[in-house]
Structures are given as structure tokens and as C-alpha cells.
Amino acid sequence: MGKKWIVFFAYLLLSSFFISSSSAGITKESPLPIGQTLSSSNGFYELGFFNFNNSQNQYVGIWFKGIIPRVVVWVANREKPVTDSTANLAISNNGSLLLFNGKHGVAWSSGEALVSNGSRAELSDTGNLIVIDNFSGRTLWQSFDHLGDTMLPSSTLKYNLATGEKQVLSSWKSYTDPSVGDFVLQITPQVPTQVLVTKGSTPYYRSGPWAKTRFTGIPLMDDTFTGPVSVQQDTNGSGSLTYLNRNDRLQRTMLTSKGTQELSWHNGTDWVLNFVAPEHSCDYYGVCGPFGLCVKSVPPKCTCFKGFVPKLIEEWKRGNWTGGCVRRTELYCQGNSTGKYANVFHPVARIKPPDFYEFASFVNVEECQKSCLHNCSCLAFAYIDGIGCLMWNQDLMDAVQFSEGGELLSIRLARSELGGNKRKKAITASIVSLSLVVIIAFVAFCFWRYRVKHNADITTDASQVSWRNDLKPQDVPGLDFFDMHTIQTATNNFSISNKLGQGGFGPVYKGKLQDGKEIAVKRLSSSSGQGKEEFMNEIVLISKLQHKNLVRILGCCIEGEEKLLIYEFMLNNSLDTFLFDSRKRLEIDWPKRLDIIQGIARGIHYLHRDSHLKVIHRDLKVSNILLDEKMNPKISDFGLARMYQGTEYQDNTRRVVGTLGYMAPEYAWTGMFSEKSDIYSFGVLMLEIISGEKISRFSYGKEEKTLIAYAWESWCDTGGIDLLDKDVADSCRPLEVERCVQIGLLCVQHQPADRPNTLELLSMLTTTSDLPPPEQPTFVVHRRDDKSSSEDLITVNEMTKSVILGR
């Protein structure tokens, strides 16, 4: 009798084992309840219900089978645990996979499958949960398309700019809470791509650009390293990173709740950590700020690149380096200068390439360097094996210097920063004679300086009196006259740390007056070509333009050779700093972009029709649209004015000025300009705001289409909705987007007469009246990096000019 009971209990034990663990799939007739699991056929992975610390909250997940403690690699219901003991995972009538929380309904779903012939769910040998059509065998859904915090071999991170599809890793909130946490790991759509970890919208860590077999910011991945990843990018705006299994071991890559990326494998007993990042303090994004260099081998970890000094010296001394560095000697760049203001490149070895790089298709380092030298916006370049030429047109951010490995980065400096030193022996041997020469020279210099200053004071005083006398207060009511001392104090003596940017006429500085009012100071360079009459015209005429969508001039300063224009300060800088930044662009959703478009249109209408002067701007572009503290747009940079008698509405000039890509065809080719030239530029500006793409950088596929060409095809094919920046798709009204694309195309039509005037434009933007169909625009081919910068100014003397016509 005892033996029979033993046999009976053995039978029950074996039966319960086969019930609780099965390699069969989930079907409509055979759901997966709590207490039962589904295994992969190779026995490596298991799917089932689990909880933390014996909690009633149950999750459906996948884990490595037989490994203690359990390591969960995927969770279905991350945000919504089930609590009913009768919960189960089942196939629905339409073929989708559903998690039922007992009588509480559906807690999670794989989405609509719409399969009439039925489907089943299986766990593959790669740990991928797959829903399969019973009739065709087609995969209807898979967990690898909906990753959590872990990648398994054969899984993929990806992006597709055309469809907006993106596959990322998202961290858990904590070790025992699988809901979505603070960190996201993704590959960026840059060329070449890189791995980027963000905390919210803030960069936290990045791998550096991909170079055929390695990430350049990971020294471990040298030329001899065979990594566990494969990266693909194509010209259609899609890319992927696939995790490979090169040794048949159990392995995983994971984004932890603390934001670290960990690669590990199982040796049969324990998990072995192969790679973790960020690990060193230099791995954290931007720890040394713009133009700061984080050195891994020596303390203190942050230093400035050669030719740069700390921006906030006291903070720097305290170990707060995030303010970064600024140039010690300002660059004077005219493309290919060879004089005393010529620029040179200083090479820095063993560098993790900084962020915000741009790829340029040059075949050797010489061409790469030459192109960067001729592009005044290019601040640095690197020619990297497996990539080719990279250039930097923005601040060098998140640069790291390794003890070994890394890349050679060449940084643009003023020639004076690389001046050589005398040899110590030569200095010692000639110290007496040199001292004598210095003393004699100093005495001579003092005498000469006295004579020059004496004569200059007379000339300068007379010049200042003449200029100030010519500038009558009644001509410029409300305009303030500032003395040089006030402006020098406000701008910290034109400190480079106060520099906001470089315009066609000279640098622009931020200043703060004694009453606390912030200002922007345009310091007109002596080489800008401005004469007395032109300068007076700008002050007298532009000061009379008052509109909420125009930057307002507050005053001027004339002392000696200095000519300064003082404008109201714009807190949020220019529109391009938001629109073309992968993170800041999220701050301007579709409603805000539409407000900006309408505000710019109102400003142009005022210039063309509502002011007592008729003003044709001739250089409307995204960098000339400034944003105030409420993100209201203001048109800026009118440049030098020129007055015409009468009421002309068009003119012709031999001095074609403006920015390539924004200029109307008739203006660029013949010099003929009118208010319709500004309308064309506004149309280009609209397409940039809608798409989030630069007119000078956009390309689509192998055909190198312009943004205008792509917008035209988009409007013809889909009404223009697929032109929209995917980052703002959730906040848009599709009909508004399609209408704006059509208006933009109406503005860039080839014939000026076909383009709307500003009154018609405002009506189009603020009503729902019917729009005429646009004619196919001229697809002007834009120049790439091999010849020019991102913004090519077409001008005789490199000035950005507006034209002011009397009514």
C-alpha cells in the first residue's frame, strides 16, 4: 500500500511539472495562467508571471531559465500589474495577444492583429515573444519591436526618419519597479550614428560616432576589437544597431535604473560584467562644458583646449566646470586669410570626438582640412578611419582625452595662439643686448605714442563733433546716445564671454546697463565697408520702425573709430538654436511654431506695407529671427539701408547680397529684387520651421534633393503632412500643417507675380479660405560642405543688407 502512494505522488509531481513548464505556444484555446510558464525550445528562456517580494502585483515577463536569482529581460505590463489570481495571457478572437486581469478586464494588449484564421504566441530561441498567423506563418507582433530595459542577441535599436519609427531602451524606475524610469538609450539619426543615453531630455552619456566596427568614444573598441554590435545606416533616413551573439553564451545589454549601460555574460555560475558606461567621471555628458576637455589620466580632470580659458574662473577654481571655456584670442576669419589674422589648426591627440559633429564626404585629410579652413563657421575637424571627415560648426561639447586610443582633433585657432618660444640658450646669450634694444625701443615708442595721441585727439574730437552734429535729435526721437565707457562697462570691456555671435558687420555682445537693463551691442567693424552716410541712414531710418515683431534699436555710440548700435536683448537667442537642436526643438511644439510663422509674417507685412517706409529685408533667414522671453519672434539684422526716391516696388542691383538657399531666383540670377523677394525667403523659412530641417543641409536619398523639392513632392503625394518634424507630430493638427506647407510652396514659386503679397499671406495664415494650387517651384541645387559653409553669404563685401524704399 505504501509503494502505491509513493507511485501516485510521483505521478502528481511529474504531471505538475509538465503543466507548469511547457514549450508549446499560447493559443485561443490554451491561454497561459499564473503558475504556468512557456519555454523556448532550446531551454534558454522562459515566459510567465512573476512578482517582487511576494507582492500581489503580478507581471508577465521573459527571463533566463534556470538562473538564480531570476534576471528578467522583458516585461509586458510594465505600467499596470495584475492582481487577480485568475489572470492569464491569451490569444483574442482577432488574433492579438491579451493579458486579462480576471474580472477586471484587459490589462495589456499587443495591439490589433485582425487575423480571421487565428494566431498563436511562441517564445523563440532568441528570447523573442512572437505572435504568428496560423495560416501564413507571418509574424504579426514581436516583443523585439517593443524593448524594455534590455537587449538580447538578435534584438535591434532603430530609427526611421520617414515613418517616425524609433526603437529605444527605457530604464526601470527601480530594481523592483519595472515601470518606465528616467533614462532612455537610443541611437541618434546623425551620420554617423552614436549611442545616446538621456535623462529626461538632458544628455547623460554618449558613445561617440560609429566608425565601421567601433564607437570612437570607447577606447576598448580599438581596430582589433570585434564588437557585439552591427550598425547600419542608409540614405533614406533610417538606421539600426543590432546586438550580436559572437560566442553562443547567455548575454545581455541593459540600461539600469541609474542610467548606466551594462554588457554582461553568464559563465555558468555568475554574471560577468564586460562593459559599463558611464563609469569614469569624464564619461558623463558635458562635465567640462563647451570647449572644455575632460582628461582621464590626470587630476584635475577638466582643462581648456589650447587657446581657451575658463569662462567662469571662480566657479572653475571651485571644481564647477560646466561653464566651460572661451577663446583667449578672437578669430578673424575671411575664409582663406594668410595675413596676421590667419587661422591655423592645432591638433589634439587621443580625443573622444565632441558632440554636434557633421559628416562631410571628402576622401582625404587634406581636403577635409582645406574645406574647414575656407568655412568660417568650421571650428574643428577630424579625419577618422572608418568614417572620413567630420566637422564641427558648434561649440565643442563633451570632449574627452584618453590615456590611449582616441582620435586626432584639429581645432581652429588664431595664429597668434601658436607662436613659438625662443630657446633658453639663445635668450640667455642675448639677454643684455635685447634689454638694451627694448629700453631704446620703449623710449622711442613713448615719444611716438605721445605725438600720435596728441594728433589723434584733435582729429577724433573733430570727427566725433561732426558725426554727432549731423545726427539731429529731432531725426531720431527716443533714441539714446551712449558713451563708450558705459558700453564698455555693460559688456565687461567687450569680453569674449559676453559675445553672442558674429554678424556680417561685426560681433554682437550682451551687455547690462547700470539700471539692470540688458542690451545687445553690435560693434561695427572697420572692415564692414560702412561710411558715415550709410551709418547715419541706418540709425535715422531703422529707429523709426516700431513693431512688436521687429527687434528695436535703443541707441548708438560714436567715439573715435568705434561705431556701436544698441538693440533690445533677446533672452532666447535666435530661432535656429531651437529648431536645429535635437533636444531644444522639443520646446517649440506645433502651436508655437505656427505662432512664430504668423508673427514673422506680421513683421514682414509691417515692413512692406504698414510702416511709413517701405523696407525690403533681403536676408530673411532662421538665424535672423530672434525670440524673446515669451518665444515671440522678432526680425533682426537689417544691415545698412539705402533710400530711393518715389514709390518704387522693385529695383536692380549689382551687389547681390543674402544667404544661399533663401534668395529668390530672380534676385540671385539677375539682381532684381522686390517685396516678392522677401516673400520667397519667408516661404523657405516656413518650410524649415515645419520640417525642422536646414535649407542648406537637407538632402533626401541619393538624388540630393533640396528641401523645396522634397516639400513639393510631399505636397503632391500626401498633402505635405509627412514633411512635418516628427518630434512635434503629436501636437499638430494635420490640416493646419498641410495648409502651411501649401502656403510655403505658394511663396517659393518661380515667378514673383505668382507669389502672394503680405496682405494675402496674412489672410492665408489666419483664415480657412481656399488656397490656389502652387506652381512647381524652381529646385535650386544647394552647395554642400565641400565648397561652402552651411550659410553662404552672396555679397561683394560680405555685408547683410536691407533696402529701404520711400513710399
UniProtKB/Swiss-Prot annotation:
Q: Where are the transmembrane segments?
A: 427-447
Q: Where is the catalytic site?
A: D619 (proton acceptor)
Sequence ranges on the Cytoplasmic membrane side: 448-807
Write down the SUPFAM superfamilies for this protein, in alphabetical order: alpha-D-mannose-specific plant lectins, Protein kinase-like (PK-like)
Glycosylated residues are N53, N94, N117, N134, N236, N267, N320, N336, N375
Assigned GO CC terms? plasma membrane
Its top-level enzyme class, in one word, is: transferase
Disulphides: C282-C294, C288-C302, C368-C389, C372-C378
Any idea which residues bear Phosphoserine here? S528, S543, S623, S636, S696, S790
What are the start and end residues of every segment in region (CaM-binding)?
Answer: 583-600
Spell out which residues are annotated as carrying Phosphothreonine.
Answer: T653
State the Gene Ontology BP annotations: recognition of pollen
Q: Which residues form the signal peptide?
A: 1-24
Task: Look up the EC number in the record and give it.
Answer: 2.7.11.1
Coiled-coil regions in this chain? none
Where in this chain does the record put each Bulb-type lectin domain? 25-144
Chemical reaction(s) catalysed: L-seryl-[protein] + ATP = O-phospho-L-seryl-[protein] + ADP + H(+); L-threonyl-[protein] + ATP = O-phospho-L-threonyl-[protein] + ADP + H(+)
Segments forming domain EGF-like: 278-314
UniProt membrane topology term: Single-pass type I membrane protein
In this chain the Protein kinase domain maps to 494-779
The name on file for this protein is G-type lectin S-receptor-like serine/threonine-protein kinase At1g61420
Instruction: State the species of origin.
Output: Arabidopsis thaliana (Mouse-ear cress)
Taxonomic lineage from the root: Eukaryota, Viridiplantae, Streptophyta, Embryophyta, Tracheophyta
